[in-house]
C-alpha cells in the first residue's frame, strides 16, 4: 500500500539508484559494440559486451518499480532514454569532426563509437519498450494479486520486458544482416541469459529491496508515494 503523502520528505535513495541505472545503461551501450562468442569454433553461443552489465538495469528497474512505483520508475527510464540518445548524438558529431593532424585513431574511434543509426534506433526502441513493460507488468501483478510472491513479480516482469527488448533490438539491427541461424542464436541466447541472471540474482534483489525500504522509512511491501 502506498505511503500517505502527508510528508514532503524527498526520497533518500532514489537519486543514487537513478544514477546507477543510467550509468549501467550508458556503459552497456558502449560495450555492446563488440560481439563475442562462448564455446568452440563449431559449437558456440553469441553475446555482445552489453550482456555483462545491461541485465542489471532490469534488476534496478524492478527495485524502482517495487519501492517507488510506476510513475517514478518511468521517469528514470525516460532519463536513461534521453541520456542514451544524447550520447549517440555526441558520438555522431565527434565522429565527423575533422581529426587533428597528429590524431591517428580516427578509424578506431569510428569503428567503436561511430554511430550507425539503425543500431541507435534498435537500441533505443528495445530499451524503451522493454523497460516500460518490465515496470508496468511488475506493478500490474502487484495490484492484481497483492504483495505476496515478490519472486513472481520480479521474474514475470523480466520475462515480458526482456522479450520485448531482445526481439525489437535483434530484429531491427540484425535481421537480414547475418545468417538466420546466427540471428536465432544471438536472440535466443541473449534472452535466456538475461532472464536466467534475474533468477540467479533473486537472493541479492530481495535484501536490496528490503534495505531501500528501510532507508526510505517504509514498512514491508509499502510503496514510497510522497
Q: Could you say what each language-model-derived stretch is?
A:
Residues 144-163:
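Internal alpha-helical transmembrane segments of multi-pass membrane proteins
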Residues 22-37:
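Alpha-helical transmembrane segments of multi-pass membrane proteins
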Residues 93-118:
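Membrane-interface interhelical connector segments
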Residues 157, 185-198:
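Pore-lining and gate-forming transmembrane alpha-helices of multi-pass membrane transport proteins
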Residues 84-102, 123, 127, 131:
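Transmembrane alpha-helix/helix-exit interface in multi-pass inner-membrane proteins
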Residues 45-54:
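Structural signature of hydrophobic alpha-helical transmembrane segments
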Residues 212-226:
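Short, highly charged, low-complexity non-transmembrane loops/tails of multi-pass membrane proteins
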Residues 4-20:
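N-terminal membrane topogenic signal
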Amino acid at each position: 500500500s502506498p505511503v500517505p503523502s502527508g510528508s514532503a520528505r524527498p526520497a533518500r535513495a532514489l537519486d543514487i539508484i537513478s544514477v546507477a541505472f543510467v550509468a549501467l545503461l550508458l556503459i552497456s551501450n558502449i560495450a555492446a559494440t563488440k560481439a563475442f562468442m562462448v564455446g568452440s569454433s563449431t559449437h558456440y553461443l553469441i553475446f555482445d559486451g552489453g550482456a555483462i552489465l545491461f541485465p542489471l538495469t532490469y534488476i534496478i528497474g524492478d527495485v524502482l518499480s517495487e519501492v517507488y512505483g510506476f510513475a517514478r520508475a518511468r521517469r528514470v527510464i525516460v532519463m536513461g532514454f534521453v541520456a542514451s540518445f544524447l550520447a549517440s548524438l555526441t558520438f555522431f558529431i565527434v565522429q565527423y569532426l575533422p581529426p587533428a593532424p597528429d590524431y591517428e585513431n580516427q578509424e578506431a574511434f569510428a569503428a567503436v563509437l561511430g554511430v550507425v543509426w539503425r543500431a541507435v534506433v534498435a537500441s533505443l526502441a528495445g530499451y524503451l519498450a522493454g523497460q516500460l513493460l518490465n515496470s508496468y507488468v511488475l506493478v500490474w501483478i502487484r495490484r492484481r494479486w497483492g504483495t505476496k510472491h515478490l519472486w513472481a513479480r520480479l521474474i514475470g516482469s523480466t520475462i515480458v520486458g526482456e522479450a520485448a527488448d531482445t526481439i525489437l533490438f535483434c530484429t531491427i539491427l540484425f535481421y537480414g544482416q547475418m545468417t538466420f541461424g546466427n540471428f536465432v542464436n544471438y536472440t535466443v541466447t541473449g534472452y535466456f541469459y538475461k532472464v536466467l541472471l534475474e533468477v540467479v540474482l533473486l537472493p541479492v534483489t530481495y535484501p536490496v529491496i528490503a534495505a531501500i525500504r528501510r532507508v526510505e522509512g517504509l514498512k514491508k511491501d509499502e510503496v514510497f508515494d510522497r
